């Protein structure tokens, strides 16, 4: 397994819509392991493939509490099939927008259909932090960032800040595979 470089704002790759995974095979399982290792190293609780430069509809997450054993999960081609009408508010952050956090309103519960690492279709009914994390990461697969839920003024301030920071650092190396 390997830690992969993170794609950060304002990289336009983050706005790209990811393509469906065609086949679950050993190379995809290895990539899932790389994604989990990258997420834990960052540290974070969720990571979409696009955040490590791969425009695939795949995400990993682990929403276990710090005092609980790790619970890594991999979602391939995830799709939200239902949402509750009840709103939920959580402070969100993002490994692609480091050190910026904001409260975001999302549906409190979602049902997500996905494929697991064995190639089997699964369904999860999620609430709480799991629902929030799944929605955040699935948004990444659609080119949507959590700052898109903020007011235009706040969003523009964040984008300006990260554009300025990007001018001061070299572009990230991209792995081609």
From Swiss-Prot:
It catalyses: N-terminal N-formyl-L-methionyl-[peptide] + H2O = N-terminal L-methionyl-[peptide] + formate. CDD domains: Pep_deformylase. Keywords: Hydrolase, Iron, Metal-binding, Protein biosynthesis. This is Peptide deformylase. Binds 1 Fe(2+) ion. The active site is at residue 137. Its cofactor is Fe(2+). SUPFAM superfamilies: Peptide deformylase (SSF56420). Its EC number is 3.5.1.88. One of its GO terms (molecular function) is metal ion binding. One of its GO terms (biological process) is translation. Removes the formyl group from the N-terminal Met of newly synthesized proteins. Requires at least a dipeptide for an efficient rate of reaction. N-terminal L-methionine is a prerequisite for activity but the enzyme has broad specificity at other positions. Fe cation binds at residues 94, 136, 140. The keyword Aminoacyl-tRNA synthetase does not apply. Belongs to the polypeptide deformylase family. It comes from Chelativorans sp. (strain BNC1).
